[in-house]
């Protein structure tokens, strides 16, 4: 198996020169420059979200990714149609292959690490091409016969080009030019945009109750002003159906607070210099969210691809029993989006429930959904540490390279001790991320529980990175000022 793994990575070598690549930073990038590059990346993403695809004839067809758009950072009918789906899917596939030892990757060697990243990028490009062709052939932009060969090819080229841009923007940030990763950044931007829009949107929608504002807060003020019965107006603003309400908004705020609170949970392992064991040591923190938001990102990639395949197959073969097992779809009554929802099969049982009333009405669905989310997040979290350089062996090697050891342990036994904490922290942290996502979904939070989790963890990590950089700069400045003051004193008395 190891030999086949090496052969697989070797097969990537001939393609490495043709893959788009961002050069690594040759010097340390100042924090203000990182903020500038990060802002440019966000601006380019928002621009691409607003530029419609040229050549499409139908924008009102059912959207297989409607329920996942916020999390996939995509926007239907625009250059950002694919969003981060190709990158995340390629990462998911390569992670599973490496984690299950189907391919042999030694993350400790530079060559294997480079080839693995190249293989992931190559797979991402192939998935971009595959999804672009699938979107066009599935009729998402109109019948292929109506589009014509020229328009169909043009749409595929636009989707492919924008997909390559997303891959390059992600690599730009990953190479140290910006803060965080484009994947998390785009999701956070999309989620925050969705929350703001659903809170303050002035768009009016004609429902069975009459014309209403889409924005929850706008609707609250409108109902309080126009209704004579203020108690009923408040009740309608807090609990209206099929549109964002104030309860959804309050649930969103509560989830934000909970995620920020749990971000501070960590276990600190004491470490000391290997050659000076009497010196005051430091601490190596193992956070509750050890793998951050990666488990939920990978779980989302899995579900989104299943949704897409299931809905396309059901549309073409609605009477096939095997397709029914994968998922049955229909448009719900009183729907203002016109989108399909899963009503049976695997797709239904792994879809979130959006209120406690739905839990009571279908407890089997709720139970299976909870089991799926918790198990998949724990599994992805444990697998992720093996390919991301954060496993017990990787951390042990990093500490040895820094001439550090765990207090009370020899260097040879350090990995065994770390194995007691890191895999458990990864699995438990993944389950906690999944549990918070479930709670947010059950409470009906705006932007979905998964989306809010991704947004909060991304914003929190970015804040920590900026704070660390500013603190480091301040400490360096204080050191220079002190040295300068000492030098001046020596000159005065020398």
Curated annotation (Swiss-Prot):
Topology in the lipid bilayer: Multi-pass membrane protein
Keywords from the named record: Endoplasmic reticulum, Membrane, Protein transport, Translocation, Transmembrane, Transmembrane helix, Transport
Coiled coil feature spans: none
Gene3D superfamilies assigned to the protein according to its UniProt record, in alphabetical order: SecY subunit domain
InterPro entries, alphabetized: SecY/SEC61-alpha, SecY_CS, SecY_dom_sf, Translocon_Sec61/SecY_plug_dom
GO cellular component, one term: endoplasmic reticulum membrane
Predominant location category: endoplasmic reticulum
Subcellular location: Endoplasmic reticulum membrane
Disulfide bonds: none
Pfam families: Plug_translocon, SecY
Residue intervals passing through the bilayer: 36-56, 79-99, 122-142, 147-167, 177-197, 249-269, 294-314, 359-379, 426-446, 450-470
Domain of life the protein comes from: Eukaryota
Any GO BP: protein transport
Role this protein plays: Appears to play a crucial role in the insertion of secretory and membrane polypeptides into the ER. It is required for assembly of membrane and secretory proteins.
Similarity remark: Belongs to the SecY/SEC61-alpha family.
Subunit field text: Heterotrimeric complex composed of SEC61-alpha, SEC61-beta and SEC61-gamma.
Protein's name in the database: Protein transport protein Sec61 subunit alpha
Organism of origin: Pyrenomonas salina
């Amino acid at each position: 198996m190891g030999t086949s793994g090496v052969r697989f990575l070797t097969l990537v070598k001939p393609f490495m020169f043709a893959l788009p690549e961002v050069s690594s930073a040759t010097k340390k990038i100042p924090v203000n420059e990182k903020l500038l590059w990060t802002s440019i990346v966000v601006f380019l993403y928002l621009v691409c979200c607003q530029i419609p695809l040229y050549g499409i004839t139908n924008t009102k067809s059912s959207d297989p990714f409607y329920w996942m758009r916020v999390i996939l950072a995509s926007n239907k009918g625009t250059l950002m149609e694919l969003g981060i789906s190709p990158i995340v899917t390629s990462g998911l596939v390569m992670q599973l292959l490496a984690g299950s030892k189907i391919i042999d990757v030694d993350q400790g060697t530079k060559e294997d690490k480079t080839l693995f990243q190249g293989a992931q990028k190559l797979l991402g490009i192939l998935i971009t091409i595959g999804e672009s062709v699938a979107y066009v052939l599935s009729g998402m932009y109109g019948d292929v016969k109506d589009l014509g060969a020229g328009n169909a090819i043009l749409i595929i080229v636009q989707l492919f080009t924008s997909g390559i841009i997303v891959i390059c923007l992600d690599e730009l940030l990953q190479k140290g030019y910006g803060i965080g990763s484009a994947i998390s950044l785009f999701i956070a931007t999309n989620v925050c945009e969705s929350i703001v829009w659903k809170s303050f949107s002035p768009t009016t929608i004609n429902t069975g109750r009459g014309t209403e504002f889409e924005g929850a807060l706008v609707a609250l003020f409108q109902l309080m002003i126009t209704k004579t019965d203020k108690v009923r107006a408040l009740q309608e603003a807090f609990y209206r159906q099929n549109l964002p309400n104030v309860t959804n908004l309050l649930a969103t705020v509560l989830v934000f607070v909970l995620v920020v609170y749990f971000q501070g949970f960590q276990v600190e392992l004491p470490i000391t210099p290997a050659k000076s064991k009497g010196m005051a040591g430091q601490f190596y923190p193992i956070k509750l969210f050890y793998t951050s938001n990666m488990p939920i990102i990978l779980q989302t990639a899995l579900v989104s691809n299943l949704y897409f395949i299931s809905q396309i197959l059901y549309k073409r073969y609605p009477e096939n029993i095997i397709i029914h097992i994968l998922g049955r779809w229909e448009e719900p009554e009183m729907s203002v989006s016109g989108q399909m929802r899963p009503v049976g099969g695997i797709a239904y049982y792994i879809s979130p429930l959006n209120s406690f009333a739905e839990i009571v009405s279908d407890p089997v669905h709720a139970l299976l959904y909870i089991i799926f989310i918790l198990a998949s997040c724990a599994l992805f979290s444990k697998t992720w540490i093996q390919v991301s350089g954060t496993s017990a062996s990787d951390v042990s090697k990093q500490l040895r390279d820094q001439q550090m050891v765990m207090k009370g342990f020899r260097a040879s036994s350090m990995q065994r001790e770390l194995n007691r904490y890191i895999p458990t922290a990864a699995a438990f942290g993944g389950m906690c991320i999944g549990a918070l996502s479930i709670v947010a979904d059950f409470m009906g939070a705006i932007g979905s529980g998964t989306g809010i989790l991704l947004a909060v963890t991304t914003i929190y990590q970015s804040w920590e990175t900026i704070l660390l950089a500013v603190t480091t700069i301040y400490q360096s400045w204080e050191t220079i000022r002190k040295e300068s003051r000492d030098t001046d004193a020596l000159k005065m008395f020398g």
